[in-house]
Amino acid sequence: MFDWDAFMLARIQFAFTVSFHIIFPSITIGLASYLAVLEGCYLKTRNPVYKQLYLFWSKIFAVNFGMGVVSGLVMAFQFGTNWSGFSEFAGSITGPLLTYEVMTAFFLEAGFLGVMLFGWNKVGPRLHFFATCMVALGTFMSTFWILASNSWMQTPQGYIIENGVVVPTDWLAVIFNPSFPYRLAHMAIAAFITSALLVVATGAWHALKGKRDAAVNKMLSMGLGLLIVLVPLQVLVGDMHGLNTLKYQPAKIAAVEGHFKNEGNEPTPLILFGIPDMEAEETKYKVEIPALGSLILTHSLDKQVPALTEFAKEDRPNSTIVFWSFRIMAGLGMLMLLLALWGNWLRRGQRWGNKPLFLRFAVLMGPSGLVAVLAGWFTTEVGRQPWVVYGVQRTVDAVSGHGVLPMTISLAVFIVIYCSVFGVGTYYLIHMLKKGPDDALPPETTDMIAASGHVNVA
């Protein structure tokens, strides 16, 4: 049925493991900062609702963090097992960057995570708050180093090639490569949006079940307040990222747009929908808006976007995949904006309690951030092909020399283990989210909240 060689199986295996892994950091990055905000608000106001939410979401964070660490370690091993050609060629750059992540971010998280999770009643409130902030900083620093490495693979600079391997000459240029600032901002905002959607969906779920206490209202209010700021900001950052990609990876943009040929000097249309055909070099059944592609991508009606046929066939990314992955990401972004606008309109007077249609929509949008992150990752990585280091090393030259049989067996083992272990972990997470924040507190603390007059306060 499938005539895949070892190279394709290695790509599928890496895509599978990374797709699993990226889910967990996308949640923990935002949740860590959310926990820091909750604890800071509690220390300032002494409103026990903030403590209630902190203790609840810290459990969600802990499970996500654990699964993220495990899946990340497995992914890192594949650089040596399946992609030894890449490790030999570019290891002098990617190796130190990953080491910096371990020496800074991971050590910071590991050093303070225990205090954060188990030290609420064992250390002073300021020290505990400091530990939470350090964990949040650690998650962001991890994002910094990982994206520095990945961005260098997208827009490499600050190196020379000696004896067939990469040698760094300017570490600042390596780290702060042309695409890094945009990709870091885009991913960080995406992680915060993903966490906000999860918080909103959890609050909406419990509101639908008839639970309308202060914790539920606070989750909805804080999550929607963050979304109304971050979703429009993400649109702006995404536009800037697109312009950067057009400058340094024009073939990727042409593939994303499904744009195969320019017509004379006419401005480039925006293809909304269609079916890209790489063999026929056209997008079939397309629905397009004239000139809008030029306006969005060049901010001008006089310029054209490079077409895919302007690049050699062996240098073209697969338009069929990135065309639709980008539209999934963008379409979900529009739905997120709708949720943010609708929710903040209802936020005045907390009118979402009697709006079951909105609450159901919010629950359905809960996992949309994760789907959008995955779609964006596919757009970025598939759009980089056929290069592993853009314009420098081809992916086919980076793979190890394994045969089809061992790659097939290892892929099957990964699928079974990942689906089993992370399936159970995900089931446990959903179970905790359904139980709600009240279960994170002992009965006497819940009684204290009711007696404090904060039950109906958002």
Which residue stretches match the model-derived regions?
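Polytopic transmembrane helical bundles with strong interfacial aromatic enrichment
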Residues: 1-458
